[in-house]
């Protein structure tokens, strides 16, 4: 029977969980603020990890840019903490990437809600 998930998928899920906890509890950089780890993609050799993040309540590009700089600066520290909590031969090099999809999804949801309201108003007026 074949496995449902590759090892890299399982490691990526664990990294997502652990990095989220580390960002919440250990990283004290004020530039980072409320950050959410939305996804992790890891290379097949487990040497590199792309960590996709979003910043809650902040859509300002300057705040996002400062937050990303804070994450990049904290990356070695996060990697060392990750190495302590996960038993991996090689702890992947972390690369943080801003995930625009959550913001786009919220914007699309708001647009749909507004269109539905306008449509309901038209039907009530008729």
Swiss-Prot record:
InterPro entries: KH_dom-like_a/b (IPR015946), RbfA (IPR000238), RbfA_dom_sf (IPR023799), Ribosome-bd_factorA_CS (IPR020053). Keywords: Cytoplasm, Ribosome biogenesis. It is found in: Cytoplasm. GO terms for biological process: maturation of SSU-rRNA. Pfam families: RBFA (PF02033). GO terms for cellular component: cytosol. PROSITE patterns: RBFA. Signal peptide: none annotated. One of its GO terms (molecular function) is ribosomal small subunit binding. PANTHER family: RIBOSOME-BINDING FACTOR A, CHLOROPLASTIC-RELATED (PTHR33515:SF1). One of several proteins that assist in the late maturation steps of the functional core of the 30S ribosomal subunit. Associates with free 30S ribosomal subunits (but not with 30S subunits that are part of 70S ribosomes or polysomes). Required for efficient processing of 16S rRNA. May interact with the 5'-terminal helix region of 16S rRNA. Belongs to the RbfA family. Monomer. Binds 30S ribosomal subunits, but not 50S ribosomal subunits or 70S ribosomes. This is Ribosome-binding factor A. It comes from Histophilus somni (strain 2336).
